[in-house]
Amino acid sequence: MTDSSIHQNPSAVSTDGPSLPPRRPPRRTRRSVLIIDAIANWTITIGGLGVILAVFGIMVFLAEVVWPLFSGSHVIAQSQARLEGAASDVLTEIVDEYRTIVVSVERNGEVTINHLATGRLIKTRKFEIGERKVTAFARTLNGESVAIGFDDGSLRLGRIKIETAILKPSDVPGGLTELGRGDRTDSEAVYSAIEGDQVRRIAVSVDLDEPQPIAPEGTALVALDFRLGGAAERPTRSFVSIDASGAIRLSRLETKRSLLGGISGKATVNSTDLPALPAGTQVASILMTSLADQAYVVDRAGTMIRYDTRATQKPSLAERTRITPEGVGVTTLGFLVGEESIVVGGADGSVNVYFRLQRSGSDTADGFVLVKTHELERHAGEVVAFGASPR
């Protein structure tokens, strides 16, 4: 077949080979898809930048919060107020969590409530102690529970309840007396205006349990410490005491309570005598842990005597060590929160912190020793008291 014949008869061309697919018209992306895609891109970009800025903002905030820890401290403001009706022999003082009132417990059993900012007297209450003389006193860390030892060898446990209530302005009684700084009183409680168009009422009540004989009758208690424990239905109150003869006792008072409320049965006291103190010991202070497994006695010369009372039926004198330099007496003693740190204040103005640590090869009865772990800046005068925050 010649070329001319092909042109003359196109149907003669073979069609047995593969054929090309038909050409399709070009596609165009819809405008709505392009708009959505652009919005998604911008959203992701802006969101990513926002996350980065948020992280940097958190870093700046944390740096601002932490920086004061490294920049030292300074006093922003301070104020002083003389407490009206305050006695010279105060056993302890308690400030409420809002720093509105201060409660003072005096040796004669009176409990005075003052406005903290101005010192004005709000109310005077009283523990009814009769003719007994207070010779020893202890309180829990938050100050709500107290133990009072007397000259006849008895002990009474009490409570100081700082009660807070939030009121509507319409529930506030009339005729209140202005105290200053936005506080008012009706001579029973303090009323403070707070946010949300509300008023906070703070009042104090006290009560005292019946006396419990601890030492032989007529032998005064000279040192005391007190802790709370146990379960709600069977609360326990443990205390360690030293009487005028030098005898030291670990006691536990247990009361049965009904789950439906009220007290069932009579409070019972179980006491254990601890090994006698060395002859001539002049006790400055005494401490006990909440578990009643350790007791610490400090004499006025600066020697600490530690008792291991984990086995209550067989307590031991575990350690005797000096915690102040020779010739320097101990003026204050107490626990920090957790009862692992013991703060010791000295007549030379020193403030040191001790821990009870386990050490192999120690010559103590239980393998633990008291170790000075922190030495704080010395004060100009002797340290006579300190207060630990409950938080």
Residue spans of the language-model regions?
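Short loop/turn segments immediately following the C-termini of beta-strands
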Residues: 55-65, 107, 151, 160, ...
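Conserved beta-strand element within WD40/beta-propeller blades
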Residues: 52, 102-106, 146-149, 239-243, ...
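Canonical WD40 repeat/beta-propeller blade segments in eukaryotic WD-repeat proteins
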Residues: 87-94, 132-138, 217-231, 280-288, ...
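A short beta-strand motif characteristic of beta-propeller blades
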Residues: 77-85, 120-127, 209-215, 269-277, ...
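Short coil/turn segments that connect the beta-strands within blades of beta-propeller domains
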Residues: 98-100, 142-144, 235-237, 291-293, ...
